[in-house]
Regions:
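Generic structural signal for well-ordered alpha-helices
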Residues: 10-18, 42-53, 78-83, 123-127, ...
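Short beta-strand/loop segments at the ligand-binding rim of alpha/beta enzyme cores
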Residues: 1, 55-73, 129-141
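Catalytic cores of alpha/beta
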Residues: 73-87, 130-135, 145-162
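Glycine-rich phosphate-binding active-site loops on the catalytic face of alpha/beta enzymes
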Residues: 28-30, 91-102, 144, 151-167
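Active-site glycine- and acidic-residue-rich loops that bind
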Residues: 1-11, 38, 45, 66-86
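Active-site beta->alpha loop and helix N-cap motifs at the rims of alpha/beta catalytic domains
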Residues: 1-25, 30
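Glycine/Thr-rich beta-alpha phosphate-binding loop at enzyme active sites
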Residues: 31-40, 44, 78, 83-135
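Structural preference for beta-strand elements that scaffold enzyme active sites
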Residues: 23-25, 62-66, 91-94, 137-140, ...
Length: 167
């Protein structure tokens, strides 16, 4: 984060990175970055999506851009993100990053909660976004995956791909 304005940061990063990978992830979900999750609110999310797509077009790039979504969003945010994603042909959503809900673990821990405690919440978001987008947006399922059964569960709920951090 070099500037106050996220769009300036994303522009700098996109122009440096778009030739180097197979896809780009815009992580709007980190619980450790103050204010970052505010970018999942509809007006902010739409600005980011349209800005990134404009940058991609200006650079004659076809690189897929995926957006990592927080598990700690409201039902309205889910609907708004789904509608914006459909209207703007978003390449995919990564569901989900760590949660700030510590009800299932020691509440004194700092940072976000991941691993097994995130599994059910991640699955809920996968199911909801798959339904809200009628399966038209690719979903990468992540969170609480420990074995093949966990992978199958996420795929049955609508995940197209799976991402595993550590198990």
């Amino acid at each position: 984060k070099d500037t106050i304005e996220i769009l300036d940061d994303l522009k700098k990063l996109f122009e440096r990175l778009y030739r180097l990978g197979d896809y780009i992830v815009i992580n709007l979900s980190s619980p450790n970055t103050p204010g970052l999750r505010d970018n999942l609110k509809s007006q902010n999310f739409e600005k980011i999506v349209t800005s990134i797509h404009r940058l991609r077009d200006e650079n004659n790039s076809k690189i897929p851009v995926l957006f990592k979504i927080s598990p700690d969003i409201s039902e309205q945010d889910k609907k708004d993100i789904s509608l914006i994603s459909l209207a703007n042909d978003v390449d995919g959503l990564i569901l989900t990053n760590t949660t700030i809900n510590k009800s299932m673990v020691n509440k004194k821990l700092e940072g976000g909660v991941s691993g097994r405690p995130l599994f059910l919440k991640s699955n809920e978001l996968i199911r909801d976004f798959y339904t809200l987008t009628s399966g038209k947006i690719k979903i990468i399922g992540v969170g609480g995956i420990f074995d093949a059964d966990d992978i199958l569960t996420k795929m049955k709920l609508g995940a197209s791909l799976i991402q595993i951090y550590s198990s």
